Swiss-Prot record:
Family according to the record: Belongs to the DapA family.
EC primary class: lyase
PANTHER family: 4-HYDROXY-2-OXOGLUTARATE ALDOLASE, MITOCHONDRIAL, DIHYDRODIPICOLINATE SYNTHASE
Organism superkingdom: Bacteria
Regulation: Inhibited bye p-chloromercuribenzoate and salicylaldehyde. Activated by salicylate.
Reaction catalysis annotation: (3E)-4-(2-hydroxyphenyl)-2-oxobut-3-enoate + H2O = salicylaldehyde + pyruvate
Stated name of the protein: Trans-O-hydroxybenzylidenepyruvate hydratase-aldolase
Pathway: Aromatic compound metabolism; naphthalene degradation
Pfam families reported in the protein's UniProt record: DHDPS
Length: 328
């Protein structure tokens, strides 16, 4: 049976981006079948029960670059089975070339994933023409698969310029994008003309929502440190939109914002990107809501002071979650 594609307006609220839970031996290159499938199911159910609107997976912190093909298929099946159609599940299928990406995306579709979170092949830094054609080819090959563009310039050696957004907005399968920063948000929104729902990170959501009414969804890796923090942000911004009173949302950002600082070594996104996986998993493990497990090689090495900053970030997020629960 043919599936109906999502529309940008179908993407709303708080979307959690999750790690791929790893078994205890996952940092050993000899390890096989490293995905903790039981923890995967528990996390998906916990996020849905907490009110999360959608789930993104198998990005950078999701270790798509270091999972085996069989592990990816096992993880996708665990995600889809646990969600059971209750929220959209987008899975990363980016590979180093178009044909492998198409093959994995077809397999994800057959398993039941709702969409792919798709970056661009990065062995050679892509030109705009190459990047746009990559998405066009994927949409032609797997026309029933929704696409979330994974716009991470550090990971993919690509700046995702305005000319790129203007062209991919013409692809019906491209319904949303995991978006970073707000410096270019307004011109990028003008380029996409309402055809793609841009998702800023949780720390930018308040500011982005104040800038443009179309910003009514965001992504959050902190959701797996405690989803109550993420859903509280969503609900406070929604209430502010309804009432015109942004004071509570602004005050909440004063509590949420400081949790980000320790995550970024020397305040640098570039430095963070070098150790992204190890830092995010350290943060999540310290948060205590889930067991993200160890990091798969070769990205399991990270300076200890950087890891301690990430752990502090996770503990701060978790403490905020406990405070919010006590205030209810």
């Amino acid at each position: 049976m043919a599936r109906t594609l999502m529309k940008p307006d179908d993407v709303k609220g708080a979307w959690a981006i999750i790690p791929t839970p790893a078994k205890d031996d996952a940092s050993d290159w000899r390890a096989t079948k490293t995905v903790d499938l039981d923890e995967t199911a528990r996390v998906v159910n916990g996020l849905i029960d907490a009110g999360i609107n959608g789930i993104l997976s198998m990005g950078t912190l999701g270790e798509a670059a270091t999972m085996t093909h069989d592990e990816k298929l096992d993880f996708i099946k665990a995600l889809v089975d646990a969600a059971a159609g209750r929220v959209p599940i987008f899975v990363g299928t980016t590979c180093l070339n178009t044909r492998d990406t198409i093959a994995l995306t077809r397999q994800a579709l057959d398993i039941g994933a709702d969409g792919t979170m798709l970056g661009v092949p990065m062995w050679c830094a892509p030109s705009v023409d190459v990047a746009v054609q990559f998405y066009k080819d994927l949409a032609e090959a797997v026309p029933e698969m929704n696409i979330a563009i994974y716009a991470n310039p550090e990971a993919f050696k690509f700046d995702f310029p305005r000319s790129f957004w203007a062209q991919v907005a013409e692809i019906p399968q491209v319904v949303t994008a995991k978006y970073i920063g707000v410096a270019h948000l307004l011109p990028d929104l003008a380029a996409i003309r309402g055809r793609i729902k841009l998702l800023p990170i949780d720390f930018d959501y308040y500011g982005a929502a104040r800038m443009d009414e179309s910003i009514d969804a965001f992504w959050s890796s902190g959701a797996v440190c405690d989803p109550l923090v993420t859903t509280t942000l969503r609900d406070l911004v929604s209430q502010a939109r309804a009432t015109g009173d942004w004071s509570a949302a602004r005050a909440f950002m004063g509590r949420l914002g400081p949790t980000a600082a320790p995550l970024f070594p020397n305040g640098s996104f570039k430095e963070f990107s070098t150790y992204n996986i190890a830092l995010e998993k350290a943060r999540m493990n310290a948060g205590g809501w889930m067991n993200a497990g160890p990091v798969r090689p070769p990205y399991h090495l990270c300076p200890e002071p950087y890891l301690e900053g990430a752990r502090l970030s996770g503990r701060m997020w978790a403490e905020l979650g406990k405070a919010l629960a006590a205030e209810k």
